[in-house]
Amino acid sequence: MKFSCEKALLQAAISTTSRAVSPKSSIPALEGILLEAGNELRLTGYNLETGIRTVVPADIQQEGTLVLGARLFGDIIRKLPDDIVTFRADHYMVNITCGMSEFNILGTDPEEFPELPTVEYQNTITLSQAKLRAMIGQTLFAVSDNESRPIHTGSLFEADDKGLTIVSVDGYRLALRHEAIDKKEGAESFSFVVPGAALSEVEKICSDVDEPAQIIQGARHVMFKVGSTMLVSRRLEGEFLAYRQAIPRNNTIHVVGDTRALLASIDRVSLIISDKLKSPLRCTFDHNLLKISTKTAIGDAYDECPLEGDGGGLEIGFNNKYLMDALKAAPADRVRLELTTGVSPCVILPTEGEENFLYMVLPVRLKAGE
C-alpha cells in the first residue's frame, strides 16, 4: 500500500471520520480508521451505531487496506508540516513521511474492522446542504436525552409532496421545521427517525452551500450523502409522538414580538438563574407588553419587552432555557406567540407567509412568591 496526498486534505478527512470512531471498544479495530487505497483513497470510522466514510484526493501508487489508531494517526498528521504526505505500508508496519518528518507505526488487520451496513434504496430525498444543515440545527436542541423513550432520542423525518418536515420532542418542548425539497423518489410519503447523535454529525458535515445532500432511507438504516462524504446510521424503531394532535391550534391569545428583543430580555433576567439556583420565569402578557421576572436565593430580576397585541394580563411560567432555545432557533426576525391559559403550551410561529417553523414550549407551574 502506497499513496501520497496533501496534508490538509488528509487531516480534514481524519477529522471527519474520527467523529464515528469508538474511543474505547472491545473490538480494537473500532478505535481506528480504516484506510482503503484502490481507485480512490477512502477513510472510514464506525462505532456500530454510526459510520462515516469520506474520499480523499490522492496519488495511489499501490493498492491496499489497513486500520490505524485514530488518535495517534490524527495527531501525527495534524503536527506534520504543510506539505505532501507519503504513506507506505508493508503488512501492518506503516511509514509516514512529510518534509523532514518521518514516523513508523504499527497498524491493525483490516479484516477485524466490521463492514458498514448496506442501505437498500427504498426512498430518497435531495435538498441543499445549507437547507438540511439549518433544519437539523433548528430542531436538534429539542431531542430527548431520556433513554426510557429511545424513539424520542432522535428526530422524525417526514417526506411527502409538500416537502420535508423534521420534528424533535423531549416531553417539555417540540421543535418543527418544514422546507420544500429538490427531489423525492420512492413512496408518495414516508417517515423515519434518525438518532440525535448521528444528526449532530450530519450537521457538521454539511456546509452552507447550495450543493446537494441526499438522504437514502433503507429498511433498518439511513444514509446521508454530502459531497465526497457519506454517513450511515441505524434507524430508531418505535412509535413517535403524534405531534400534530399535541400542538394546540385554537389559541385565544396572539402576540407578535421582535425575536432579538425577546431573547435579550429573557437573557438579562436569566442572569440570576443557574443550575444550582433554578427558578421559572414569570411572564405576564399585558397590552403591547411582556413583563418578565424571576426570584432566586441571591435576588430577583425584572425586565420588559414590547409586543404587538393584547395578552389580557395572562401570567405563565417558563423554563428560561427552553424558551431561549426556541427563540434562538427561530429563523425569523419577528415571531408570533400563541397562548390560551397559564397551564397550556406556548406556540411560537412565523408572523406571516408559509408556516415553515413551529416551536412549542410547555409551561412551568408558578408558586406564590416566585
Model regions and ranges:
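Structural preference for solvent-exposed beta-strand-turn elements
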Residues: 1-370
